[in-house]
Amino acid sequence: MLIKKYTSDWIKNFEYLKLEIDKGLSGIDYLIEHIGSTSITNLDSKPIIDIDIIYENESEFGKIKSGLIKIGYYYNGNQGVEKRDVFKRNGISITGTLDSIIHHLYVCPRNSKALERHILSRNFLRNNDWARLEYQEMKYELAEKANQNKKLYAELKELNVNEFIDSIIEKEKRTTTSKKTSKT
């Protein structure tokens, strides 16, 4: 099965990955966020940990890139998404953790639209059971349509889920804005 039942192991796996990445980026100013479906409690998902490394100043990117290369990643460009750089494992095992836990690693500046999209959709799905359940149902339906084929599933998801994600992002923006307004 392409979609797996939720497990708290995904949160633990993120923490293990974060620990190893932190070792490679020691002395650099950044944040690490667990994003994507595996970051949302009780959301069934493909068992792939999605991670965003976030930096404030442009000068930090080169340092982050060098640190990631030292711990066995290679730079894979932005893959067509502005202000979201992709890093992949190079096959040289320096640490078992980074090679044994399947993950996607992105590096984004704080002002990245891709980062905003990741964080807002994650937060909304974490806080709204109805949206989580609807999204989960879509994922199962698409996996079935794709005959459990990963590549076809990704294509179908891109075509069929963006409208839903866009709508929950707008709802989360309104929620975030109203919370900020009520504090002032």
Regions found by a protein language model. Name each.
Residues 1-4, 44-47, 145:
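A short, surface-exposed helix-loop junction/capping segment
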Residues 2-8, 52-53, 121-125:
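Short histidine-centered catalytic/ligand-binding loop motif
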Residues 63-71:
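Short amphipathic alpha-helices in soluble, non-transmembrane regions
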Residues 73-112:
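Conserved catalytic core of two-metal-ion nucleotidyltransferases
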Residues 111-184:
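Catalytic cores of NTP-dependent nucleotidyl/adenyl transfer enzymes across multiple folds
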